[in-house]
Amino acid sequence: MKKAFNLTTCEGDADFLADPVETARQLEGYDGIELQVIDDPPGGLVDPALVTGLHMACVPCWYALWTGDEKGLLDEFGTLAEAEEYYGGPLTRDTLLSKFRRDLVWADRLGAEYLVFHIAESRVIESFTEEYLHTDEEICEACAEILDILFEGRKAGPLLLLENLWQPGMNLRRPEITRDMLEAVKYPNKGIMLDTGHLMNTNTSVDTQEQGLAWIHRVIDAHETAGFDLCGAVRGVHLNASTSGALAKRVKEAPPKLEGSYKDRTSKMFFHVFERDQHRPFTAPGVKDLVERLAPDYLTTELITMDQDDRRRKNSIQLNAIK
């Protein structure tokens, strides 16, 4: 099992890679990093030897664009001009695909062993209300379509890992959806990236890490009972904890009033999502046994950190919890 920690190329996040001493300090106990390329890094900053995996672009709201639903775009963005600004180009499928194709280029350039792709979709208001317009089936079908286009003609290459969230898509609440989603993708080198914190977020009764741990085992058990070997399909794990059930219930009962531009509304949404999806070290007794049960090829400590010292401290805490 290879161990990595999450890193982005946002300004300031990966700067330590220019310092070999600090890089070695940050990587203590780890085999590499799982990188998300947001800003193009300066030439030579990211040593391909350090990159274990690459996290593909996260686009929370994309279904209306993909299906050519102009009314859906107007309902979400207010104007088509705002939608074009959000997506960074014309309102076509190619604009969305270009974001993911850029990731494939970077994966090849950096020699990433695996890629992570979110199987989910959520409009801004749905992040608060959790009352969704689209079904798991609709989102998974569209995701499979996207991935089949992106990987068309590829018989081999990086391991493609489908990640669970708590919105519509492959959220692991329904074993038949998990099975069908994995089978729908034609690219052969594939598996699941199970995010433990995201899975905790599917149950708003989870308010402690112990409850979250028990819930994850229940989900695995439910898949086994349904005849699907979830542990066998899980090739990667994003290890973290999110115990925000009470917050989710409170916000759902009294969602905020969303005003201003789409950028203003998404800013409020992202602030809430980071409260909801806490990405803290998962340290409950039994987390080591969970990792051993899942037995992934890749384990990434995916945590929210404030600076280099905070990252190193939290990554160390997470590693110690599974020793």
Give residue spans per PLM region.
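Histidine-acidic metal/acid-base catalytic patches
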Residues: M1-K3, L97-R102, W106-E113, Y187-L194, ...
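N-terminal pre-domain/capping segments
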Residues: M1-R102
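Residues lining hydrophobic/aromatic ligand-binding pockets adjacent to catalytic sites
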Residues: A24-L27, L35, D108, F128-C140, ...
